[in-house]
Structures are given as C-alpha cells and as structure tokens.
C-alpha cells in the first residue's frame, strides 16, 4: 500500500513539473510585454500581451485565419485598461480592465473589448463583449517579425494605439 501511494505521488509530481515546464517553454517564445501611456485628465492606459514571432510563417489568413476571433497575442488573452471614461476608436469606454480580441480581415478588422479578463487566450465568450468596432488594416512595406503594440502619446492628449505584425498595421486613436 505504501509503495502504491509513493508511486502515485511521484507520478503527480512529474505531471506538475511537466506542466510548469511547458508553460515556461511557451512563455519564453512569446514573452510578456507591458505598456503604459498617459493622456489628459488622469487618463492612464495599460496593455499587457504576449509577443509571438513569425518564424518564417504566413500569419494573417493562414496561422491567424481571417474572419475568426483571435486573442490578439499569444498565451493569456491580451488585456487593456483605462483609468477613466475615454474614446477607444470612436467608441466610449468606461474605466476598467478588458480583454482585447480581434477578428482579422484582409482590409478591415473588428476590434473587441470583452469584460472577462484573466482567461487563457482561447476561452472567448462573446456574451461578455463590452464593445465592437471596425478599423482599417494598412499594409506595410516593412515586415514586423514579432507582434508589436505601441502606445504613442500625441498632441492634444491623444494616444495612438498601434498593432504591427507581418505586413499589417492597425491604428486606434484614444482620447
């Protein structure tokens, strides 16, 4: 009986170590990035996302299919938070933390803010969407190897939120 219990504990220990190893391995290939920008009247924006690499793959339309909800990053769902009421794109957003999802298209993408945060990146629940809107996707001549978000503080207290990966760029103004 003691021998069986010891074997069970050893197997459980090995499984736990394997799961932590896999998690560490995947995170090292898509590192976590955190961004912060400040606008007017105490507006602060924070973004946290994991940055996958192209690795000689075709991204949009293949690895990330068109017209399918995407977690907009790797690993955990990307999050964005706002410290006060503001405009994200042309939509009003109340203060809070949201998960950021997208539906890529060749010419236009749907941007989604979802009220659920903290989930693994594939657990999307449409019933918890806070808002959706479309933005134009711009093709770039320069290839971006690793998914890159930027928060750029502009004049008149605007903040530009950009997404670049492969040869695609999205621009969402925030104020």
Task: Specify the residue positions occupied by each region the protein language model found.
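Hydrophobic membrane-insertion alpha-helices, especially the h-region
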Residues: 6-21
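Aromatic-capped interface at the extracytoplasmic side
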Residues: 19-35
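Short extracytoplasmic
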Residues: 39-66
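Structural motif
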Residues: 40-41, 88-89, 165
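Mid-length scaffold segments of soluble, non-membrane domains
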Residues: 72-118
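Surface-exposed, gly/pro-biased binding rims or lids
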Residues: 118-158
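Short, exposed beta-strand-loop hairpins at the edges of beta-sheets
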Residues: 158-166
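Edge beta-strands of extracellular beta-sandwich domains
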Residues: 171-175
């Amino acid at each position: 009986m003691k021998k069986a219990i010891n074997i069970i504990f050893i197997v459980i220990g090995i499984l736990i170590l394997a799961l932590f190893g896999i998690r560490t391995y995947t995170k090292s290939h898509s590192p976590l990035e955190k961004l912060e920008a400040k606008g007017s009247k105490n507006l602060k924006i924070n973004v946290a996302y994991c940055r996958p690499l192209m690795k000689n793959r075709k991204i949009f339309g293949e690895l990330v299919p068109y017209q399918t909800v995407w977690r907009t990053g790797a690993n955990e769902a990307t999050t964005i938070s706002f410290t006060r009421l503001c405009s994200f794109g042309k939509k009003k957003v109340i203060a809070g933390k949201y998960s950021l999802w997208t539906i890529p298209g060749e010419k236009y993408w749907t941007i989604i803010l979802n009220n659920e945060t903290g989930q693994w990146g594939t657990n999307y629940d449409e019933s918890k969407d806070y808002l959706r809107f479309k933005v134009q996707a711009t093709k770039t001549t320069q290839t971006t190897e690793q998914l890159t978000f930027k928060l750029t503080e502009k004049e008149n207290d605007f903040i530009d939120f950009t997404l670049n990966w492969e040869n695609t760029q999205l621009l969402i103004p925030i104020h």
